[in-house]
Amino acid sequence: LTLLALVAGAALLGYIISLFGGIVTILITAILLAQKSLVQHVQQVADALRISLDEGRQKVAMIVGRDTGHMDQPAVARGAIESAAENLSDGVIAPAFWFLVGGLPGLMVYKIVNTADSMIGYKTEQHADFGWASARFDDLLNLIPARITAALIALPAGVHSQWRNIIADAKLHRSPNAGWPEAAMARAIDIALSGPRAYEGQMQDFPFVHPAGNQFAGPSDIDAACSMLWKAWGIALLFTTILTIL
């Protein structure tokens, strides 16, 4: 009966969405595809870690920018989970938010700025000014979505009562935005995120986010993070659909 209810609900939702034109269908489809791709890439790290540490390192190297060659298992797992939380924010929630705020123009502006920040950022001296500007604009555009993402993670996890702790944890992060979804995810599955890591051969001693959490993360914690991604996405999709129709 539950399955039938879910199928019927999905069919009804699909019918309602179809009544409101192709653009809404395209938006919902894009959100679904982005979420599915994100979960698949993160889940692949867990699956690889179950085979060997080297396999896990190779998979996590595809979704993080830090050095992965000397990572231990907890570092690999943390990297995957941090990427999951951050990309839920800037790859799924933020595009939907800016579409709701500004329609297609809002969405396009966000995607262009986010892509510019990802591709250029501070990577070359030649484009330093453009990189700085795109990074700052990207920070501005993700200010609200990052905090919404944190709430979307905290709510189904039942850790919304720890919101003050999430705020405090978010401030430990070097990014003004990435710390929010990461802090919420850390509390949701009770593990410590961030912490020391290497970039271009240089170790950087970043503080842990939710330092009281488990510091020995593994494949099962990545599984838990993927489950949280789907729960947060489900709530986001519901609100996006309702607000788009209204």
List the predicted regions and their residue ranges.
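Active-site His/Glu-centered metal-binding helix of metallohydrolases
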Residues: 112, 116, 120
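Hydrophobic alpha-helical transmembrane segments
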Residues: 1-108, 121-246
